[in-house]
Amino acid sequence: MGMEGLLQNSTNFVLTGLITHPAFPGLLFAIVFSIFVVAITANLVMILLIHMDSRLHTPMYFLLSQLSIMDTIYICITVPKMLQDLLSKDKTISFLGCAVQIFLYLTLIGGEFFLLGLMAYDRYVAVCNPLRYPLLMNRRVCLFMVVGSWVGGSLDGFMLTPVTMSFPFCRSREINHFFCEIPAVLKLSCTDTSLYETLMYACCVLMLLIPLSVISVSYTHILLTVHRMNSAEGRRKAFATCSSHIMVVSVFYGAAFYTNVLPHSYHTPEKDKVVSAFYTILTPMLNPLIYSLRNKDVAAALRKVLGRCGSSQSIRVATVIRKG
């Protein structure tokens, strides 16, 4: 379908929300808004800490800062509109707004898939080839990894968004979701989308399996290397280096596995919305918290910054007292 078809489709959609008719919309708004603020704050703090503390100017933390940037944009794609809909009776989203939401969502989730895979490779090099780490993970390689993650993630967006929005939507304009997720949008189409859904399923599984293969191979080599270590301290450091990444991967890929791998018989609109809420709202909050709570370097950098702020405040108070 060409431009004429797109123009015929260019009318507003209606989002039903996370809960279609919430009994306490104010309470739901407060919960989601609190999570949103914590997620944005935690990710921005992580980015600033990595930028400010010279001890964190390493490839691992550079990649972690990029993950925080992705998480910050990721949660801003869906949550502000969701919060607006909780307070407003007008829950519409424009055709263009829906298309933009789909494109950014696919780009960010795909980008995170690839970035988490490349972060596993970084851990593999650090544990298995520590002497060659500066060479194998130099600045050019890190930049290539980040650009590759964004480009790889955007492939899904560029391929799937135009096709999805080209279908004729002649049924209800009501999307049973809190944002424009492709399966929910396709249910409004009055044409057979089964072939496209099969191809989309294969595309998403491929996007999932490529980085998952990198993660699996990397951690297999890490486990073999750790097993051969004689030093208990060396083993502890190796596991400490990888534990935060493993937790983040488990959370993110667990939700993605449900969405992209399980057959349609397991899916219901209610389940889909809960899982989507988990990895679009909760995951961006959990990622920086997991890394900050389980990582001594990040915790030390945070204490250092807080200590500076406390010292500066004490000096200001003392100066004011002297002047008084």
From Swiss-Prot:
Described function:
Odorant receptor.
Q: What is this protein called?
A: Olfactory receptor 2T2
Show the GO MF annotations. Answer: G protein-coupled receptor activity; olfactory receptor activity
Q: What is the lineage of its organism?
A: Eukaryota, Metazoa, Chordata, Craniata, Vertebrata
Q: Which SUPFAM superfamilies match?
A: Family A G protein-coupled receptor-like
The Swiss-Prot or TrEMBL record describes its family as follows: Belongs to the G-protein coupled receptor 1 family.
How this chain sits in the membrane, per its record, is:
Multi-pass membrane protein
Q: InterPro entries, from UniProt?
A: GPCR_Rhodpsn (IPR000276), GPCR_Rhodpsn_7TM (IPR017452), Olfact_rcpt (IPR000725)
What organism does the UniProt record list as the source? Homo sapiens (Human)
Its cellular-component GO annotations read:
plasma membrane
- Specify one Pfam family: 7tm_4
Q: Which residues lie on this side of the membrane: Extracellular?
A: 1-26, 81-101, 160-196, 261-273
Q: Would you say which domain of life the source belongs to?
A: Eukaryota
